[in-house]
């Protein structure tokens, strides 16, 4: 990857160059194909970057469940990745995550990249509620009789049940240190 600017975990560079390790709803298990990708791609790329190589990641949960459950899932998914990467000999000091249980910023980025027709409406609702709370979810569910919520649920929420990771030179990583 040839990147010359800071990479944030919500920008298109990260989204396009990271691998989403996607989880089943309410689960934290990592698939065999993802383990193969880590072994055959991620680790060699990280080694090629030398001492400055880190893994940049974003651990998330989709917003359809209760917020406390989404917090638990995002943290547990991060812990699952840490444990797996540790088994491959990767020190957690070389892993930088944003942990975002209900990832509305990433949802908006994905919608923008897809030129989704509902983006302006969804963005307005998310901003109105400052990206938090049950009122935000309730309002999204009411829009157009649930049509927009169902669209988000089918098209984008599966992508939010993930830990997205990529190898990168640490000088190019721009992470927001959130409490784990």
Predicted regions and their residues:
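Short, surface-exposed beta-strand segments enriched in small/polar/acidic residues
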Residues: 47-75, 85, 96-105
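Alpha-helical transmembrane segments of multi-pass membrane proteins
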Residues: 29, 41-44, 48-49
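Terminal non-domain segments
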Residues: 71-72, 84-89, 113-115
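Glycine-rich loops and low-complexity Gly/Arg-rich segments
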Residues: 46-49, 80-84, 120-124
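Short glycine/proline-centered loop/turn elements that form peptide/ligand docking sites
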Residues: 80-83, 87-91, 99
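Periplasmic OmpA/Pal-like peptidoglycan-binding modules at the C-termini of bacterial envelope proteins
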Residues: 7-33, 51, 93-180
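Sec/Tat signal peptide C-region and signal peptidase I cleavage site
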Residues: 2-5
């Amino acid at each position: 990857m040839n990147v010359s600017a800071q990479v944030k975990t919500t920008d298109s560079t990260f989204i396009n160059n990271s691998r989403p390790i996607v989880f089943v709803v309410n689960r934290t298990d990592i698939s065999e194909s993802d383990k193969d990708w880590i072994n055959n791609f991620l680790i060699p790329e990280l080694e090629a970057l030398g001492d400055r190589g880190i893994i940049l990641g974003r651990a998330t949960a989709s917003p359809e469940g209760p917020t406390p459950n989404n917090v638990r899932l995002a943290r547990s998914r991060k812990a699952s990745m840490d444990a797996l990467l540790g088994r491959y000999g990767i020190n957690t000091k070389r892993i930088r995550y944003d942990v975002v249980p209900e990832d509305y910023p990433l949802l908006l980025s994905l919608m923008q990249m897809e030129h989704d027709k509902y983006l302006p409406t969804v963005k307005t609702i998310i901003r109105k509620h400052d990206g938090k709370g049950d009122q935000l979810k309730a309002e999204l569910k009411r829009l157009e009789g649930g049509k927009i919520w169902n669209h988000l649920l089918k098209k984008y929420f599966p992508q939010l049940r993930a830990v997205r990771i990529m190898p990168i030179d640490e000088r190019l990583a721009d992470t927001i240190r959130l409490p784990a």
